């Protein structure tokens, strides 16, 4: 099925799609065995494009992709089986205003992020609007890159957030530091592992290395998105 426009995507993505095809069509290195493309954009105009191939990517492809990257003012990643070539960077930084504050999020290619920034902002505002019933400490399971964690942290004494993806944990740690938030800690545990740790059935070196002592927390709220 031919698709020249995808209305669910941002206007920036829709504008870039035909430009990307037109530029790539001029280069055999870029167009041959080009299988798929993924876009990650931000409200401020950052654009990360992942070009996926059914061939081995070599130096000639890199030269052509660098020229495309410069011409379209985007960041390009090339992927093939067993290959990931990052020409500039493998992330974008999104800024979302929630209430009276801007929150900055590093969103890494290949990891889960909320796909619609405008809807995401509404989700965050909705969650924060329930704060009157909150207090104490927050436990968030599977926090991703800290999407909800950051704004919710303003309404709790301490926040412990769990996540199993190393990539998402890394992004969440960056986001915490970039937003100057001091009451959040991230534990790389599944929900089952957290339960084992919290009930004392099992000890995890990961918690000790992160300086997390579960008895320091008095959880009043559990949050799962």
Curated annotation (Swiss-Prot):
Its EC number is 2.1.1.-, 2.1.1.35. One of its GO terms (molecular function) is tRNA (uracil(54)-C5)-methyltransferase activity, S-adenosyl methionine-dependent. One of its GO terms (biological process) is tRNA processing. It is an enzyme of class 2 (transferase). It catalyses: uridine(54) in tRNA + S-adenosyl-L-methionine = 5-methyluridine(54) in tRNA + S-adenosyl-L-homocysteine + H(+); uridine(341) in tmRNA + S-adenosyl-L-methionine = 5-methyluridine(341) in tmRNA + S-adenosyl-L-homocysteine + H(+). S-adenosyl-L-methionine binds at residues 114, 142, 147, 163, 225. The keyword Cytoplasm does not apply. GO terms for cellular component: cytosol. Keywords: Methyltransferase, S-adenosyl-L-methionine, Transferase, tRNA processing. Pfam families: tRNA_U5-meth_tr. Coiled coil: none annotated. NCBIfam families: trmA_only (TIGR02143). Belongs to the class I-like SAM-binding methyltransferase superfamily. RNA M5U methyltransferase family. TrmA subfamily. PANTHER family: TRNA/TMRNA (URACIL-C(5))-METHYLTRANSFERASE (PTHR47790), TRNA_TMRNA (URACIL-C(5))-METHYLTRANSFERASE (PTHR47790:SF2). Dual-specificity methyltransferase that catalyzes the formation of 5-methyluridine at position 54 (m5U54) in all tRNAs, and that of position 341 (m5U341) in tmRNA (transfer-mRNA). This is tRNA/tmRNA (uracil-C(5))-methyltransferase. It comes from Neisseria gonorrhoeae.
């Amino acid at each position: 099925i031919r698709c020249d426009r995808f209305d669910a995507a941002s206007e920036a993505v829709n504008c870039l799609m035909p430009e990307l095809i037109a530029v790539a069509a001029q280069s055999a290195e870029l167009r041959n065995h080009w299988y798929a493309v993924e876009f990650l954009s931000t409200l401020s105009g950052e654009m990360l494009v992942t070009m996926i191939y059914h061939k081995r990517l070599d130096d000639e492809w890199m030269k052509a992709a660098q020229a495309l990257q410069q011409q379209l003012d985007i960041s390009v990643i090339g992927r093939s089986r067993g290959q990931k070539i990052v020409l500039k960077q493998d992330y974008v930084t999104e800024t979302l205003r929630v209430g009276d504050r801007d929150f900055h999020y590093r969103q890494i290619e290949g990891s889960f992020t909320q796909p619609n920034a405008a809807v995401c902002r509404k989700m965050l505002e909705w969650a924060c609007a329930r704060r009157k019933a909150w207090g104490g400490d927050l436990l968030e399971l599977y926090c991703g890159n800290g999407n909800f964690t950051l704004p919710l942290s303003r309404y709790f004494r301490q926040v412990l957030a769990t996540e199993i993806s190393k990539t998402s944990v890394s992004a969440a740690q960056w986001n915490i530091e970039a937003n100057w938030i001091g009451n959040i800690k991230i534990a790389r545990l599944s929900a089952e592992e957290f339960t084992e740790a919290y009930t004392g059935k099992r000890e995890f070196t990961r918690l000790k290395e992160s300086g997390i002592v579960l008895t320091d927390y008095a959880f009043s709220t559990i949050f799962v998105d």
